[in-house]
């Protein structure tokens, strides 16, 4: 599926914030080392790195179902409820 992460987050009133989803989720993916209390495997870390690069270097990017599930899982752990909801809605369409 193609997803455009270069959109601004919105606050609780629906006003556009200065933060893009690509930049904020990209930071999480670039810096992640654990999921919950468990360390990520080398493959998961590499997937996070590749997703970070895709998201921050393109308008609309191709995301596999495995990558989408990984993003939903990671964002659910590391983002606020409002940010997580926006990312999940974007991915799940």
Model-assigned labels for residue ranges:
Residues 1-93:
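Positively charged, low-complexity terminal tracts
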């Amino acid at each position: 599926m193609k997803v455009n992460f270069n959109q601004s987050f919105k606050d609780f009133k629906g006003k556009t914030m200065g933060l893009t989803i690509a930049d904020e989720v990209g930071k999480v993916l670039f810096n992640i080392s654990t999921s919950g209390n468990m360390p990520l495997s080398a493959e998961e870390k590499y997937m996070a790195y590749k997703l970070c690069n895709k998201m921050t270097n393109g308008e609309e990017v191709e995301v596999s179902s495995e990558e989408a599930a990984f993003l939903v899982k990671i964002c659910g752990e590391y983002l606020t409820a409002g940010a997580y909801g926006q990312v999940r809605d974007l991915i799940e369409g």
